[in-house]
Amino acid sequence: EEQGKAERLAAEQQRKEAEQAAAEKAREIRRHSLSWPSTGQVLNKFGSIRSGQVRWKGLLFSTGNNLVKAAGSGTVVMVTSMKRLGTVIIVEHGGGFISIYCNNLNSLKKQGDHVEQGELIGYTGSSQGLYFELRKDGESVSPAEYLRRR
C-alpha cells in the first residue's frame, strides 16, 4: 500500500511538472511574432561591432517618430533612470523572455503595469534613438528572429 501511494504521488508530481512545462512553452515568444518597438531606421544591428571587440546586444534605432511601443504583451518589471541610458523600461513576457528599452526621455508606465503588444510605453529623446534588447533566460538574443518582418 505504501509503495502504491508513493507511485501515485510520483505520477501526480510528474503530471504537474509536464503541465507546467507545457504552459511555459505556450508562453514562449514565437519567431517573427513581436511588433517593432520603433518606426525609426535600424542604425546598429545585433552582433555588429560597437567598438573594439564589443558587439551590439540589441538594436539601435534612429529617433523615428519618438514613440516607443511594447514589442509584446507582458508586465513592466522595471522603470529606472540611468545617466548614460536615459529612462530604461523592462517588460517581462513569460517563457523566459524580457525586452529592454533604453534611451527613453520618459515612461508612460510604472512597475507592475500590464502592457499589450504595440501599446505606447514611452518616448525617446530627440538626440538618441531607441536601444532595444531582447533576452531569453538572461541571454541576449537576436531581435530580428522574433520581430515581424517589416
Pin down the residues of each PLM region:
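Active-site loop architecture of trypsin-fold serine endopeptidases
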Residues: 124-132
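Conserved ATPase active-site switch/coordination loops adjacent to the nucleotide-binding site
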Residues: 85, 111, 128
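Acidic, glycine-anchored pre-beta loop/turn
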Residues: 107-119, 138
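Extended non-globular C-terminal regions
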Residues: 99-102, 110
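Extracytoplasmic/periplasmic cell wall- or extracellular glycan-interacting regions that localize
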Residues: 1-86, 90-92, 100, 116, ...
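Activation segment
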Residues: 82, 106-107
